[in-house]
A protein has these predicted regions:
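Acidic donor-binding loop of glycosyltransferase active sites
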Residues: 292-306, 319
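Nucleotide-activated donor-binding/catalytic signature segment of Leloir-type glycosyltransferases, i.e.
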Residues: 126, 258-282
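Carbohydrate-associated surface elements
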Residues: 164, 185
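Conserved donor-binding/catalytic core segment of Leloir-type glycosyltransferases
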Residues: 159, 208-224, 230-233, 245-247
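Glycosyltransferase donor-sugar binding loop
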Residues: 243-263
């Protein structure tokens, strides 16, 4: 099939600036490049780092870049925003969509994949004969979404990253075979413990060999539950060997600018400054070196996290997981790999108790670690890509 993929209009693909959703796109584009299943054109914002990316040499995948950052593009975006007030997305995203649409209308695509942007369907209405597929990684289409029925009806297929997201879509309707779940995957070869002599020593992270080091990785934002984790650490103030490594910043790739929440968080952690280290943003390729230093991963999301890759990465590194009964998280783990907590009024206290329990029971951690390694094999990027393209077969026979 001849396929167009409309990206989010925020981060570039290939994923030279990171972003989980952009990484997922890279995975199935890489798979398509190897197996040559379809002819795919990706519509993405431009970034200078894509210029010499090897993905651009593919014979089956091509890229159409929209400039949104040059001074001329910024002027055009500003003018666009002045004349378009009632927009479904931010005017910068809508500008990207308009520029991409100018090219799309010249092409005869069989299928257009709207990547995490189901609202794009409004702009495409009546302007293409292609079938629309929504590829959802977040809760962006449910009964509370603006124009939800119109958007739902416009799709030939809706692929979601978890049953949680699929069930949210089904609050609108449950048409036969329209909704399918395809679990995301990760680079298992990257996230594996390897006997290397890297420069990341435990002492650099403020811990010794006899310490119990926990890791939190992800965006340092309120909904990720990091404040509750710090509060749990404060309840464990009399346990000097329990330490925490916080990996991440408030936004992807942002190593310098701290928002008010991050500043408040560090102030709260001040009494435990010798036991909590904030690494800031860590490049994706360096993440395994940090994770392998930890004994346990704590991912205490207090919102309905659709399918956080941090859970998959932790299990692939053989880390026992402490997380929550929110969103798609229960779909990523088993009772043998993780301890899941309710985010109720007792959450912080129960989080502290769970941390202390794993600290005091190394044999339990060892069993959970072995189970995590085994379970993680279900979430390879290859299986993800294969299942994604298998889902597309549902509509292939109906394409002209």
């Amino acid at each position: 099939m001849k396929i167009a993929i409309l990206t989010s209009g925020i981060l570039p693909v290939p994923s030279v600036q990171g972003g989980a959703v952009e990484n997922f796109l890279d995975y199935f584009l890489e798979y398509n490049n190897i197996h040559k299943l379809h002819t795919i054109t990706v519509y993405s914002v431009y970034h200078p780092d894509v210029n010499h990316h090897p993905a651009l040499t593919s014979q089956v995948n091509s890229y159409y870049f929209v400039d949104t950052t040059s001074w001329f593009a910024k002027i055009k975006k500003h003018i666009f925003g002045l004349f378009h007030k009632d927009l479904q997305h931010h005017f910068s995203i809508e500008y990207f969509l308009r520029e991409a649409m100018r090219h799309i209308r010249k092409c005869d695509y069989d299928v257009i994949v709207l990547n995490n942007r189901p609202g794009y369907a409004d702009a495409l209405a009546g302007k293409t004969n292609a079938k629309l597929i929504y590829n959802l990684y977040n809760d962006k289409l449910n009964v509370t979404t603006r124009a939800h029925q119109k958007i739902y009806d416009a799709a030939s297929l809706i692929i979601s990253t978890s049953e949680y997201i699929t069930n949210r879509v089904k609050t609108i309707g449950d048409s036969a075979n329209k909704c399918v779940t395809v679990y995301s995957g990760i680079e298992l070869d990257r996230f594996t413990r390897k006997p290397t002599s890297d420069n990341l020593s435990s002492s650099k992270l403020g811990s010794d060999n006899d310490d119990f080091l926990m890791v939190f990785s992800g965006r340092v934002t309120q909904e990720k539950g990091i404040m509750e984790l710090i509060e749990a650490m404060l309840l464990l103030k009399d346990e000097p060997h329990i330490k925490l490594m916080v990996i991440g910043s408030s936004f992807y790739g942002n190593a310098n600018n701290e928002n008010n929440f991050a500043k408040t968080l560090k102030m709260k952690a001040e009494p435990l400054k010798d036991r909590i280290v904030f690494t800031g943003f860590v490049p994706y390729q360096e993440m395994p070196s940090y994770l392998e230093k930890a004994d346990v991963a704590v991912i205490p999301s207090v919102w309905d996290d659709p399918f956080p890759t941090t859970v998959l990465e932790a299990q692939a590194m053989g880390l026992p997981v402490i997380s929550t009964l929110r969103g798609g998280i229960p779909e990523e783990v088993t009772k043998d790999t993780a301890i899941l907590l309710a985010t109720d009024e007792n959450f912080v206290e129960n989080l502290a108790k769970t941390i202390l329990d794993l600290y005091n029971h190394p044999d339990k951690r060892k069993q959970m670690s072995a189970a995590a390694l085994k379970h993680s094999q279900q979430f390879s990027k290859e299986r993800y890509a294969r299942n994604f393209f298998k889902a597309l077969e549902n509509i292939k026979e109906t394409v002209h």
